[in-house]
Amino acid sequence: MSDSPVKKGRGRPAKAKPEETASPKAAKKEEKKVEEVPKKIEESTKPENGAAPKKGRGRPSKGDKAAPKRPASGKGRGRPAKNAKKVDDADTEEVNSSD
């Protein structure tokens, strides 16, 4: 068998000691000096064709309403609003004007 300790369980392995992890070759290497290269900064982030920035990215803000759902073909706009149900007003005007 090898010199390595016997692994008894499937748990997380013990943390290695710094003496074991450091190799003698790593100590001999000299640190290389890194030259800082200036990155090219783009002048503008706008698209070239002049299009508006895309919407619908990420989570919507808290006050935003949900987008209106597209009705199936031939179904109209669904249930009318509550304030649009007053239809009796037209009938009462005809009766009042005949007097």
From Swiss-Prot:
Task: Give the UniProt entry's GO cellular component terms.
Answer: chromosome; nucleolus; transcription regulator complex
User: Where is the protein localized?
Assistant: Nucleus, Nucleolus; Chromosome
**What are the disulphide bonds in this sequence?**
none
**Function of the protein:** Binds preferentially to the minor groove of A+T rich regions in double-stranded DNA via the second and third DBA-binding domains. It is suggested that these proteins could function in nucleosome phasing and in the 3'-end processing of mRNA transcripts. They are also involved in the transcription regulation of genes containing, or in close proximity to A+T-rich regions.
Q: How is it modified after translation?
A: Phosphorylated in a cell-cycle dependent manner; substantially reduced in cells that have finished proliferating and are differentiated. Phosphorylation at Ser-4 and Ser-23 results in a 10-fold weakening of DNA-binding activity and altered the mode of protein-DNA interaction.
* Modified residues annotated as Phosphoserine in this record: S4, S23, S73
Annotated region Disordered: where?
Answer: 1-99
Q: Which residues bind DNA?
A: 7-19, 54-66, 74-86
Matches recorded under InterPro entries: AT_hook_DNA-bd_motif
Work out whether the entry's keyword set contains Ubl conjugation: no
Spell out the Basic and acidic residues composition-biased ranges: 16-46
Q: Which SMART domains match?
A: AT_hook
What is the name attached to this protein's record?
A: High mobility group protein I
The answer, when asked if Transcription is one of the entry's keywords, is: yes
**What protein family is recorded?**
Belongs to the HMGA family.
Q: What keyword terms does UniProt attach to this protein? A: Chromosome, DNA-binding, Nucleus, Phosphoprotein, Repeat, Transcription, Transcription regulation
Task: Provide ranges: composition bias, Acidic residues.
Answer: 90-99
The Swiss-Prot or TrEMBL record annotates one GO molecular function as:
DNA-binding transcription factor activity
